[in-house]
């Protein structure tokens, strides 16, 4: 009996791995196309293609790949607007038109309303432990909103989702959520100087002390990496492996940031300059 169980588990692991490889092969053209704009967004499309095949036993249509790519680029533009960063108005209008043509007008409108509400309550940087918690919750809410939107988009091809509801109850999407959060941590660590200068909320700008922010971010990364409450089924093996890789990368980036902050302490840090400017004002 144990041999049969082991053989069945091996088949499921092999099957899930082949599905992941197939999704990567189908999405390869996206790496050299104009859309989506970054390799990380291509990997996101790959993940949803693989998840769809796991659930529905068939890959996503190529047309849906293009819609997901447009949605990811549209999200990047809207986030840049809320952050006060440069963005392409032409790109924003073009991606919005693609989404409207795909029948996603109502979903996009709902997302923009929810996103406006979240951004209207975004926490300010450089606070206490409570501020870090609020910033983390804000970051998580934005990620869950966009993941829910992507899931709702895939729902038009057989995925049972409900509108733009965030994927709280879906164990498989929870793994993807944690992968994205690890990537968010990596991005926040790498963009610390720019975020601090601009006064943007992030994992590293949330706390008044950079050292405390690094430690709290490290703890958050460990929590996202924890697999105790994640599904252990063999069909999600590729996702669990991806989470492990993202977690290792996040930990390494945090360790490097900790080392740099310890060896390069000076009064010219973006955090210090921002405080000095506020005091002189």
Predicted ranges, named:
Residues 34-49, 64-67, 84-196, 248-252:
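All-alpha helical catalytic cores of prenyl diphosphate-utilizing isoprenoid enzymes
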Residues 12, 58-62, 93, 166-170, ...:
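Generic alpha-helical secondary structure signal
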Residues 86-89, 194-197, 201, 236, ...:
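Structured alpha-helical bundle/scaffold domains in large eukaryotic membrane-trafficking regulators
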Residues 88-89, 93, 204, 235-243:
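Short, charged, amphipathic alpha-helical segments
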Residues 169-231:
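Active-site/pore-lining binding-face segments in mid-to-C-terminal subdomains
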Residues 217-281:
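Catalytic cores of phosphodiester-bond-cleaving enzymes
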Residues 18, 95-103, 220-231:
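Hydrophobic, Leu/Ile/Phe/Ala-enriched alpha-helical segments that form helix-helix packing faces
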Residues 1-73, 77-81, 108-117, 121-132, ...:
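Conserved N-terminal diphosphate/IPP-binding helix and adjacent helical/loop segment
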